[in-house]
Amino acid sequence: ADGYTRSTGKMSMVIAQNGPGITGLVTPIKTAYWNHTPLLLVTPQAANKTMGQGGFQEVEQMNLFKDMVCYQEEVRDASRMAEVLNRVIEKAIRGSAPAQINVPRDYWTQVIDVDLPPIVRLERQAGGSAAITKAAELLSKAKFPVILSGAGVVIGGAIEETKKLAEKLDSPVCSGYQHNDSFPGNHPLAAGPLGYNGSKAAMELISKADVVLALGTRLNPFSTLPGYGIDYWPKNASIIQVDINPDRIGLTKKVTVGINGDAKLVANQILEKLSSDAGNIDRQKRKDLIHQTKSAWLQKLSSLDHE
């Protein structure tokens, strides 16, 4: 379900037998949570009249997933099924994470008449004006800006906006762990993924950054994991982190500017605020280095293929 949602952009549902089936979902649901994947988790529960009596393989399913979903709710009456289901789905979409609906087994066989609740879809939010202005100033004056694109770029449909930013600044674009789809790999400015089994070219390039725009990423530890003997995270760079979830800004790395907002909206806001000469400092030198670094890494990979 996680892979389907991430590859298609369509929200999916996961359901399993109560007890052992549900416990088998623990790690996959937490993975989807950290991947910002909106999912509907349906957990059948023991029937109301036997709940809490220690029936065969009964577990506390709400407590089990408490720290693994952005929202959870148990259906208290069959007549509220549509209402609760609608709310849980919307919470998953708004939180960009799994949300859980817990349904007692005796409700699965009831036939009732319900009024379908209206779907209220909230607009994704833009970044705060002060933070956007500061981010644009840093990027406009940067000598070696680097973009690190993550899941939020994919979820927010911000790939084109990321390309525009990169091309305006002639900045290399590194991708977060498991998010190679956040920037076209055939683009001249694409440096490849960081972190575990990542691109040495991406690591070498981001190590030179004086400003990093972490766009739509929580800066997953696996995305900043040292590789090939390179501790590449730029310790003296200004870090601009953009995430739809404010709790994840500054969670793993120190940030200079935190922007709570949708990656696409924020990218457009920054583009509008960049100075007319943004990216001009050492532009050609930077472009040449990107090309040389990528070429050297590709040659190394080619030699490995033939060993």
Predicted regions and their residues:
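Conformationally flexible catalytic loops at phosphate/diphosphate-handling active centers
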Residues: 87, 91-141, 294, 298
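Thiamine diphosphate
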Residues: 1-48, 199-220
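Phosphate/diphosphate-binding loops
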Residues: 195-249, 253
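Phosphate/pyrophosphate-binding active-site segments
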Residues: 79, 102, 114, 137, ...
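Gly-rich Lys/Arg/Thr-decorated short loops/hinges at beta-loop-alpha junctions or inter-strand turns
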Residues: 42, 64-70, 109-122, 184-185, ...
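Conserved thiamine diphosphate
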Residues: 10, 56-95, 208-209, 257, ...
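Anionic-ligand anchoring segments at beta-strand to alpha-helix junctions in alpha/beta enzyme folds, i.e.
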Residues: 2, 15, 127, 134-212
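Short internal beta-strands
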Residues: 41-43, 102, 170-177, 240-243
